[in-house]
Design a protein with these regions (language model features):
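Sec-dependent bacterial lipoprotein signal peptides
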Residues: 1-19
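Conserved functional micro-motifs across diverse proteins
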Residues: 19-156, 160-205
Length: 205
């Protein structure tokens, strides 16, 4: 084997090792990693006077949040994480650009309009969310609107979609066609490269 071939082979071996090597994190580090603004799992879209923050929530993230970010042992963590497979979940936070007013109250003309807005989020908005999974078009399997009652400057939609796979093997693109504030179609995509990063993370208990 000549020197050039030997060098190429060595580089390929190093690449393969780096692809399979696990990156260790504590639960706190994992949480920060998933929630990082500007990271691959948290997307922010500004549309008119509103800001939509779309947070992808992997199974381990959900399981850890349910357990207040503290597991008794790794078996408990793995069992709950596996049970959450097959459905992808997102938190969609809806706020105003100014941050001074809750979206339900922003420029509202009165109680009747406020109630119409609230009713939309409670009973209609789920129909206007779509998840594009490769060439598949999926509608929500779970939807909850978390009303802050104007106590803070944002409200939250929790929304889930059932996949044909246990874990995503195609990019995820969440779209919301706004029928309330006329801000158009809101899009947030989680790329396959980003999703594959999760395979190389080892969370320590």
């Amino acid at each position: 084997m000549n020197k050039v071939a030997s060098v190429i082979l060595s580089v390929l071996v190093l690449i393969c090792l780096s692809c399979t090597e696990k990156r260790e994190m504590t639960l706190a580090q994992y949480r920060n990693y998933i929630e990082a603004k500007g990271g691959g799992f948290c997307k922010t879209v500004t549309a008119g006077p509103l800001i939509y923050t779309v947070q992808y929530r992997p199974p381990l993230y959900i399981a850890a949040a349910e357990h207040k970010w503290q597991f008794n042992d790794s078996t408990e963590m793995k069992t709950r994480t596996m049970a959450l497979g097959g459905i992808v979940w997102f938190n969609v936070r809806i706020g105003t650009v100014s941050g001074a007013t809750n979206p339900l109250k922003s420029d509202v003309s009165g109680v009747a309009e406020y109630n119409d807005r609230l009713n939309y989020w409670l009973t209609q908005a789920a129909n206007h969310f779509t998840l594009y999974y490769g060439d598949l078009e999926l509608k929500p399997q779970g939807y909850v609107f978390e009303n802050s009652y104007g106590l803070i400057s944002e409200d939250v939609v929790v929304i889930g979609f059932r996949l044909p796979d246990t874990t995503p093997v195609r990019p995820l693109r969440l779209e919301y066609e706004d029928q309330l504030y006329n801000t158009g179609i809101i899009k947030a995509e989680i790329s396959m490269d980003v999703l594959q990063e999760l395979d190389h993370i080892q969370v320590k208990i």
